[in-house]
Amino acid sequence: MTEQGPLRPLNPQGFFPLLNKLSTWMWKNGDTPLEHGPCVSCADLKGWLDMLNEPLQPHHMPPRPSRQATPAQIIILGFLGIILAGALLLMLPVSSRMGVVTPFSDALLTATSATCVTGLVVHDTATYWSPFGHLVLLALIQTGGMGVVTVAVSVVMFSGRKIGLRQRWVMQESISAPQVGGIVRMTSFILKAMLLIEGTGALLLSLRFCPQFGLLQGLWYGIFHSVSAFCNAGFDLMGTSAPFSSLTGYVGDPLVWGPIALLILAGGLGFLTWQDLREHRLHFRAYRLQSKLILVSTAGLLLLSFLFFQCYEFRLPQWAELSGWERLNAAAFQAVTPRTAGFNSVDLTLLSEPGKLVTILLMLVGGSPGSTAGGFKVTTLAVLLLSARAVFFRCGSPSCFGRRFQDEALRSASAIFLMYLVFFLLGGTLICCIDGVPLLDALFESASAIGTVGLSICGTPGLSLPSHLILTFLMYVGRVGGLTMIYAVTSGSPVSSQYPQERVTVG
């Protein structure tokens, strides 16, 4: 009798091939009597049993689920990290003019407002924060306007390190690019365009501020307000004349509100639109469909809002102290600034009820995808309106400019619109219940937060801490995007199966 070696552990993965062979043999010979049919040979039996004794191979192991963060998770965590770091810096005594420690709640709201390029503040920017605090705010505004991922990729580019496929993938999601290819060139173009636009705006504003505030302070004011306007942040340093006054002292000065309005529009058009403008110039037909929708929708919103403010709002008795020239300037600027900018050239508390409502709608719409602006975006509005037109006229799929939309665009637009509407109504209702402010004013504050605008009527400093936390959450959701938040939370969820269709009547 030969001595047997130690028993090896059975390979569980060999069970399935064995089961497959046995079932095949039984299927072929199941109807044959055992005494007349073929039987299993010893060689076959030995080969089958050896399957169970085969050692485990590395390639037999099932792949482990990836634990790498998704682009959506990277984006929301990046913004959260920048906000917390900014809040800690603003809490330092060196950040305030009085050299005191700023409460964490105030620092958190201010840092969130700066990073999310909103403009809602509890302390006047010019009088409360020190020059160091202003630098911190400017860095947060620039980082939030460009996007955390864009800034990180830019640092990697300048360091000379190679940008991998995963970084390109995250960058594509961050700027809403149509494809990964050419994303590095796109990032380089964004940086150059940003520096050119902000530099030009700073120069134009300095020509007006330097004679008024002196050379150094005028240059600093030009740089700060240029970056704040291009990033659609709405932070200003004009509180030295009157706290929270914004640009009310320049209502009839186009040398100030004009460059700021142009900077707001440039930042709100989106990076892809800039690329089309650079490559195709005035050849509108050569633009991609998204750029056409952005330009046409933006022009339409600007025209309609300007006509409303000029023909109705600023003809009311409460604006009688403004001259005809100042009313024209105020109407033009008021049509632009609700596009998530946050500057104001008039006292917004004097707005009529229809004026407040129109401003709320403009703040909710916001700017364009892949831009420094917030809101549920003009492309979302365009897709919904064109889809409604297709339903009304029974045109089949919604289309424009000789192109039709994919079904995913309509589903995403509906989800984004509903999400913003729910957060806007819920936030405004909670603020109204907590602080007892009028509902329309509370909705104005809520729309300003989730649209990352920064305009205020009821006065953010006068609200309670729970309302401040609500506004902080709304600003964060409005900047990172509703779908980005959902994708980050639901990543890794199993794909649902396709169920049978059944007709449902709507409307």
Go through each PLM region and give its residues.
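N-terminal acidic, proline/glycine-rich, low-complexity intrinsically disordered segments
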Residues: 2-3, 52
